A protein has these predicted regions:
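Bacterial N-terminal signal peptides that target proteins for export
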Residues: 1-8
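Acidic, polar-rich low-complexity tracts and alpha-helical solenoid repeat scaffolds
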Residues: 19-224
Length: 224
């Protein structure tokens, strides 16, 4: 029995050592993809969602007033989320450090790309807007030509646009929105892009155009 335990441990050790991030083999990619997903990334994503839920459950919306397009925390409210967002940042960094697989200039682990987007979103909720823009720019620059990263690149562009608007730089948001908005988008992305346009025009003081986009977003809103 002791022999089999030692043999199993030795085989497992050889497998783990063999699954290097420097080898572009299917088994290596799947090992690091699975490990990143179900360990660090999962925990970081859960921490982020817990933080968002905590804020949304405490936030009381006044339905007698015009509701905001987005239910985001202000700078003071964001401090309550710091511990959850910091955990998301920590776990995302762990994914990137331990599971990044770059070959011929392209990232092969989709959860590394997702980890960068989680970093951007966590920074956004912490009101660290410059760092949010840096993370979004990195995603666009490094993964913009990778098919498996199309989803994350879209959300990074949208988040960058929203961040610019919140910083009072609406002029910088328009090209990002224009670049994101296409008829080929999924229903969810199409709706979110319309909503972002409404936010852009509203914050720019162009109320008639904002109203048009709010109406369009209302028509494409998902039904529960």
């Amino acid at each position: 029995m002791q022999y089999f335990r030692l043999a199993f441990s030795a085989c497992l050790l050889l497998f783990l050592v063999g699954c290097s991030t420097t080898k572009d083999k299917w088994v290596n990619r799947k090992y690091h993809e699975t490990t990143a997903h179900y360990n660090a990334y999962f925990n970081g994503f859960e921490a982020f969602n817990d933080g968002v839920r905590t804020f949304e459950e405490k936030e009381k919306l006044n339905f007698e007033e015009i509701l905001p397009l987005y239910n985001w925390p202000n700078e003071k409210e964001a401090t309550v989320l710091f511990s959850k967002m910091d955990r998301a940042l920590e776990k995302s960094a762990k994914v990137i450090k331990g599971h990044s697989m770059v070959f011929k200039g392209k990232q092969k682990n989709p959860y590394v790309v997702k980890a960068y987007l989680l970093i951007a979103r966590s920074r956004f909720y912490k009101h660290e807007f410059i760092k949010t823009l840096e993370a979004c720019a990195y995603i666009q620059d490094q993964f913009g030509n990778i098919k498996m990263a199309e989803e994350e690149v879209f959300w990074a562009k949208l988040l960058a646009a929203q961040t610019h608007i919140r910083m009072g730089n609406a002029f910088a948001a328009e090209p990002l929105l224009d670049d994101s908005y296409t008829k080929k988008l999924s229903k969810t992305k199409f709706h979110e892009a319309q909503k972002a346009y409404a936010f852009y025009y509203l914050e720019s003081g162009r109320l008639e155009e904002a109203q048009n986009w709010v109406s369009a977003a209302f028509e494409t809103a998902p039904t529960k």
